[in-house]
Regions:
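Beta-rich catalytic cores
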Residues: 36, 72-74, 98, 120-122, ...
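Loop/turn-rich, solvent-exposed surfaces of beta-rich toroidal or solenoidal domains
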Residues: 140-142, 159-178
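Predominantly a core beta-strand signature of beta-propeller blades
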Residues: 49-52, 110-113, 151-156
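Blade-terminus and WD-like Trp-Asp/Gly-His loop motifs, strongest in beta-propeller folds
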Residues: 1-4, 8-9, 76-84, 123-133, ...
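Signature of short aromatic-glycine-proline-rich micro-motifs recurring in repeat-based ectodomains
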Residues: 12, 66-78
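Beta-propeller blade signature
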Residues: 34-48, 100-108, 145-148
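Surface-exposed loop and turn segments in beta-propeller and other repeat-based domains
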Residues: 50-69, 160
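Short, conserved, GDST-rich strand-edge loop motifs in beta-rich repeat architectures
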Residues: 7-37, 88-99, 178
Length: 178
């Protein structure tokens, strides 16, 4: 069985995207934990003990003026070996515009790398232990991309063929999306 899980603050999801959170919960954003005490957590599935892995303060340190109540983590994916993960850090600016970043993390040593930072990242997944694929904006163009998590090098996948966002799954040489 599984021993460790990854999780996030579902009150933030409920507040920012009620259709994805728990709509029956009464959420008060003024009671959100500080940016230093909220973010991506590991959860011991046997004891329920949680540990903050990466805080919103970590993820937004180079950004100016991010409102603590208007940021969230979403779309957490584990690597096939369970030693790495990717996730989206999203925030809304003062004009209500959503911005997204794709992060890669090694769970074994706390290494964190920013993979995509051009404002738009949608659904992503691991292709293998060292490559991530998904729909995002890179080089100023939206599309499916493969990113080498060790080098940051990226290449388009099926340009001109897959022209819309979806929920990708990768298996060997296959890409399945909707």
């Amino acid at each position: 069985g599984c021993d460790i899980g990854l999780s996030l603050n579902f009150d933030r999801i409920t507040y920012l995207r009620p259709e994805y959170g728990y709509a029956t919960r009464d959420v008060n954003p003024s009671k959100f934990p500080s940016a230093e005490n909220d973010g991506l957590f590991s959860v011991n599935l046997k004891t329920g003990q949680t540990k903050l892995l990466f805080s919103f303060a970590d993820l937004s340190q180079d950004l100016k003026g991010v409102d603590n109540t208007k940021q969230k983590i979403n779309h957490i994916q584990l690597s096939p070996d369970g030693k790495r993960c990717i996730f989206l850090y999203r925030w809304f600016d003062n004009n209500g515009v959503k911005h997204s970043r794709l992060y890669f993390a090694r769970l074994t040593d706390g290494y964190l790398a920013l993979l995509a930072d051009e404002g738009m990242v949608s659904h992503c997944n691991f292709i293998d232990e060292t490559h991530v694929g998904g729909w995002m904006r890179l080089g100023g163009r939206d599309g499916y991309y493969c990113i080498d998590v060790q080098t940051g090098y990226y290449r388009p996948e099926a340009p001109g063929v897959l022209t819309e966002d979806g929920h990708p799954t990768f298996c060997g040489r296959y890409l399945v999306t909707d």
